[in-house]
UniProtKB/Swiss-Prot annotation:
It comes from Escherichia coli (strain K12). Induction: Expressed at high levels equally in exponential and stationary phase in rich medium (at protein level). GO terms for biological process: negative regulation of cell growth. This is Protein YodE. Overlaps on the same strand with small regulatory RNA RyeG.
Length: 48
């Protein structure tokens, strides 16, 4: 995991939706709504 990783603490739990739009993953949560996560040949982990 590098600088592109993020962590949600237990206080931030809630619905998470991830949409694939034009080669980008659009991640929507209570604290990340509308943020764009760009894939770079690795993986994205949501740690809850």
């Amino acid at each position: 995991m590098g600088n592109d990783a993020f962590k949600l603490s237990s206080a931030d739990r809630g619905d998470i939706t991830i949409n694939n739009e034009s080669g980008h993953l659009i991640v929507n949560t209570a604290i990340l709504s509308g943020d764009i996560v760009t894939l770079r040949g690795g993986e994205i982990r949501l740690v809850l």
